[in-house]
Amino acid sequence: MAGDKATESATPEKARKWNSSHSTDVADKADALSTTKAINLDISMKTLNRWLPVIAIILIMLLSMHLRLSGFYERDWPYLRNIDSFYFWREMGEIVDNNGALPSHDDLRFAPDGFERNVPSLYSYIGAYAYGFFRIFMPDMQLWQFLIWFPALLASLVAIPAYLIGSYLLNRKAGALASIFMVFSVQFISRSLGGDPDSDAIVMLFLLSSIAGFLIAYKNLNKGRLLAKKNIIYPAITGIIIGLFALTWVGYWFAFVLIIGFIILKFLSDFIMTRKYDIGHLKNVWHNNRSLIFSFAVLIIAFYVITLPVFGAKFAANPFTAAFGSIGETEKIKGELEEFPNVFVSVAEMQSGGNIKDVAIRIGDMELVSQASGVPLMLIVLMSPFLLTIGCFIYLFYAFWKRREHFDTLLFMLIWFVGFLVASTVAIRFTLFLTPVYAICSAMFLAKLWDVLIKKK
């Protein structure tokens, strides 16, 4: 009986201990589960944050494709909107029909003798071989059908280098906004619609890819080791891209003007801002910038590897001299101010761009946007790309003046802006290539404005 009583008295005690222990275990398991969920959520957010730019760019590209192809969902759609589009369609067709090679003699130009093709555009080959690749999966597709999609695809790919440029110049928000502003620019859309296989889309793709490549190479310079892999690989890739650009369009030298101008001004500014003008300090400036000079030398070598076998040794000086002759040559062959201006005036590339005010209004197509959206013109003007660009430069100047920040970004974008602004007053064609400047500067200004407003909250 005594044992039974002892057992009975011990049982509640054991139960209390067991319940307490069980509750502790449950609480520990709950804490562990909560911690695991928090860790998993943190990992998921980090993964999402890492892949968010990729997702955003894919969505931007899909929407860009849809916008440029929307006209073909209707019954009466336009095709081959200008004579250049017809010319490239014809060359691509000749390459396809001639087993992958463009005939050296063009029977349809300068009739009845024809025209000898010296260096055909790489764009015609890219289009023809891309068509051959897609025909593997869609054997019944014809070339004219493929060229509905091809220019829209090339224009949409511009979102990638635009994002990289904005990201390297400021941050990822600026990169995403730059992609949006660039591919949905009215100026760019009008020159890269589906069924209009002119070279504007691929020219813009090569131009921005060249600039993005240079910025990546510059931001990854190893100043301590001259022969570091990064000092060779990135500039070499950039040189190859610019070389392919040269095989595509004669105005490739715009990329060289930006790069060479930036390097020269960077070297001079480093020398001037320290206010020490002796040989010893000049040697220090050279030492600090030697990796940049070396990377440019690698870029030039890679460029020559691509271009000299095609154009010959005489082309070696072209990247450094083309810019000096092109604007004067454009004015010379146009003759707009003469009594009988010649046929070149009828070509959009050759028409005068007007003054700076005309260029600023044209680049934003403010009246067209106001009419299409119903938004008052004054509000459109206040949010115009030109004013946002000016706001961006004001911020960059302020950041450099107060905190010595963003000087490289300020220098690079200033060269880009001034260079293309002057070119746009000479020929209306170059207004299109001022579009990336507005897109990127507007993106940087709005991204910085967003950061300021969020911090205030």
Outline where the language-model segments fall:
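Start-transfer (signal-anchor) and selected internal transmembrane alpha helices
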Residues: 1-72, 83, 176, 232, ...
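Transmembrane signal-anchor helices characteristic of membrane glycosylation enzymes that use polyprenol
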Residues: 44-85, 90, 97, 103, ...
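Membrane-embedded helix bundles of polyisoprenyl
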Residues: 60-65, 136, 149-168, 173-222, ...
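Active-site lumenal/periplasmic loops and adjacent helix-entry segments of GT-C-fold
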Residues: 67-169, 173-181, 185-206
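Perimembrane helix-loop-helix junctions
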Residues: 219-226, 232, 242, 255-304, ...
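Membrane-interface helix-loop-helix junctions at transmembrane boundaries of multi-pass membrane enzymes
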Residues: 224-229, 274-292, 377-415, 452, ...
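Hydrophobic/aromatic-rich transmembrane helices and adjacent perimembrane loops
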Residues: 254, 419, 426-457
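Alpha-helical transmembrane segments at the extracellular/periplasmic loop-to-helix junctions
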Residues: 328-399, 409
